[in-house]
A protein has these predicted regions:
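A polyampholytic, Gly/Pro-enriched intrinsically disordered region
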Residues: 26-31, 108-109
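Generic recognition of short, well-ordered alpha-helical segments
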Residues: 18-19, 43-46
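C-terminal helical cap(s) of enzyme catalytic domains, especially alpha/beta-barrels
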Residues: 45-54, 74-79, 93-135
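Glycine-rich phosphate-binding active-site loops on the catalytic face of alpha/beta enzymes
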Residues: 29-42, 79-100
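Catalytic beta/alpha-barrel core
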Residues: 4-14, 30-41, 62-64
Length: 135
């Protein structure tokens, strides 16, 4: 009865998602963030629907993984999920002015001078795309 708790995507790696739903409900979580055991929520939309039915009114199933403006409405209508999660991210250049390209702070194939950031236009596009979805 305190703060709401969302169980993150670990359920997508479970042997039995429906058994996991029961365990997660028993633990008192309010939501489960999941792609429906698939590589994306779009691919897992049918499983998301089954998971939502299994969770019933005990928990909210949040569709996550590859959600964007082009597929959000379809994911919602196919899965029955009324909440979605999207990273809406884009790669942006680092603000570093001096760059020593001969040194790497990690793996050599990692771009040291960029980062991922939320793309406000993608967020707006997703919100606009789902604005007419009936509840």
């Amino acid at each position: 009865n305190g703060i709401a708790v969302t169980f993150h995507r670990a359920i997508d790696m479970c042997r039995d998602a429906f058994e996991a739903i029961e365990d997660i409900a028993e633990l008192g979580c309010n939501r489960i963030l999941t792609s429906g055991l698939a590589s994306s929520a779009y691919i897992g939309a049918d499983m998301l629907r089954h998971m939502q039915i299994a969770a019933g009114k005990r928990m909210i199933i949040i569709a996550a993984g590859g959600v964007n403006a082009e597929n959000a409405t379809d994911i919602i209508s196919r899965s029955g999920c009324m909440e979605i999660h999207a990273s809406a991210r884009q790669k942006v250049s680092s603000g570093m002015l001096f760059r020593r390209d001969s040194v790497s702070m990690g793996a050599k194939d990692v771009d040291e001078y960029s980062r991922l950031s939320t793309n406000i236009n993608e967020v707006r596009s997703i919100v606009e795309a789902i604005s007419n979805v009936p509840y």
